[in-house]
């Protein structure tokens, strides 16, 4: 469990309704499911189900709760989520997403912290690497880079500049290639 302090200039923007701490990060639990869906709906709307990333997640069926991270405010309400899925592309890897933060808690670094903690859990589990679809500008500070052209395919259209990966183990991506699908 990680608790983020409520002090600092960015925290003040969040308002007092979030309490004294910005968030406590925990592994995802079944009782978080309904609140996670509300956060995801608020962040992405109904269009989230049309994304190529959703096709990957549908094929896997269940996120990895011990690797996924949920941010709770002082009232124990879900205000952020970063989900991890076990997938395979030649070798076992992880697929990150969705990442979402309640609008009232955005701009405080919570999204990056959720990703950092989820990636640390993946690394501790002995994973080869993490793949995601997202903004290189957002994820680059965490070590993610664009997947080399033609190396990975997703089950649908994706902007190649938004297909990112992060190697967790030395030579973790040496045999990773092809379509990202179920493990």
Question: Which role fits each region the language model picked out?
Answer:
Residues 124-128, 134-159:
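Conserved active-site alpha-helix within GNAT-family acetyltransferase domains
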Residues 101, 107-120, 131-132:
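Conserved acetyl-CoA-binding loop-helix of GNAT-fold acetyltransferases
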Residues 28, 99-101:
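Hydrophobic adenine-recognition pocket in adenosine-nucleotide-binding enzymes
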Residues 87-96, 106:
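A conserved beta-turn-beta hairpin within the catalytic core of GNAT-like acetyltransferases
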Residues 33, 41-83:
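Active-site rim helix/loop that mediates acceptor-substrate recognition in acyltransferases
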Residues 153-183:
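C-terminal "cap" of GNAT-fold acetyltransferases
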Residues 2-4, 14, 18, 22:
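Leucine-biased recognition of intrinsically disordered, low-complexity hydrophobic segments
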Residues 23-36:
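A short beta-loop-alpha structural element at the N-terminal edge
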